[in-house]
Amino acid sequence: MASPVTVLENPIPKSGQHLLFFLTSKQQLALEQRPIESSLGYSAYVDHGVSQGVIVNPSSIAAAMRSSLITVYGITKPGTDKQYISVISPTYNLIANRQNQPIETTQKALAACSDNDRNNWVYYLNLPQGTAQYAIYELNIQDSTSAPTVYSGPTPSGNSNLAAVYFSPNKDRFIIFSNTDTRHYLYWVNSTLQSANRIAGTGSVMSASPLAATTITNVQTRSMTIFLYYMDVNTLLNRIVGKVTDNEIHWYANQVVEGAPPMKVDTLLTGVVVEEKWNCLYYIPDGDTEFRAFNDTIRDSFFDEPREG
């Protein structure tokens, strides 16, 4: 039986793509990014099946641009105890490994970043077989399958959230997490070196704090500024700024974000940089039930020198 079908031109400027929607043999929505120049190749959609349950909550979702298309990742759960890493928009499809098996996670954390081309990197936590210490797992997603890479050096807390950013001059990723210290701190790890580094001044971070990171890249100086936001033990929104050069980050002093409402203790957090002038943060304030926007104007005072604590 022939499938229903519809097509639109991708509205992203210079994408050169048609977005072709149709049904798979399992009667699920498929999307292929077909080049307008039909002689060019494309990746055929592979249906790994829909997770017959819900998007897990509490958990995390993450959005990234891939091949001129906004892709949203989440953790889904069928009617069993297993949870799977999935694409949840613009289609709903399990991500599979090279053996065509769905990729499991036992935890709630999820983060993603993009090279603004064909590559997405998705990060989550799992227990490597035969161990009791959680590890950060990385999926490099170019199509519908990926072989996980395990970061064996860092020791994230099992209830840690994650943030991830891409550094285009070196084609590196930086992942931020909270560690298993008695006193929680935030740490960062570089995708090339894979060793954990404590972020000085973050000793007030709340256990299981939400994390959000935005960036501004300077192509001429081959550097990047990271604006990292988190919740402290008093449920206040904190900010710490880092300057990336090569494989290193120089962190400045952490600061409570002036004027930001206290955070609901179980809220998550996300943000986006606007015109390189301010960061727009979304979270649920204490006593509220909806995500509210707060604009944090970028100032020179963000770059005070760091201190231990």
From Swiss-Prot:
Its EC number is 3.4.21.-. One of its GO terms (molecular function) is serine-type peptidase activity. GO terms for biological process: proteolysis. One of its GO terms (cellular component) is membrane. It is a peripheral membrane protein. Transmembrane segments: none annotated. Keywords: Cell wall, Glycoprotein, Hydrolase, Membrane, Protease, Secreted, Serine protease, Signal. It is found in: Secreted, Cell wall; Membrane. May participate in wall plasticization and/or intussusception or in cell wall turnover. This is Wall-associated proteinase. It comes from Coccidioides posadasii (strain C735) (Valley fever fungus).
